[in-house]
């Protein structure tokens, strides 16, 4: 990662996506 904040946000959104997906809800932008 070249930008730390972008990396943190990417990891944050991935975790949030996984949590909501586990709850049966899709949320947040898709991050690679």
Curated annotation (Swiss-Prot):
GO cellular component, one term: extracellular region
InterPro entries, per database record: Calcitonin (IPR021118), Calcitonin_CS (IPR018360), Calcitonin_peptide-like (IPR001693)
Residue list for modification Proline amide: 32
Transmembrane segments: none
Gene Ontology MF, one: hormone activity
UniProt main location, coarse: secreted
Compartment annotation: Secreted
Disulfide pairings: 1-7
Keywords noted in UniProt: Amidation, Disulfide bond, Hormone, Secreted
Keyword Disulfide bond on entry: yes
Function, in words: Calcitonin is a peptide hormone that causes a rapid but short-lived drop in the level of calcium and phosphate in blood by promoting the incorporation of those ions in the bones. Calcitonin function is mediated by the calcitonin receptor/CALCR and the CALCR-RAMP2 (AMYR2) receptor complex.
Sequence similarity: Belongs to the calcitonin family.
Record-given protein name: Calcitonin
Gene source species: Sus scrofa (Pig)
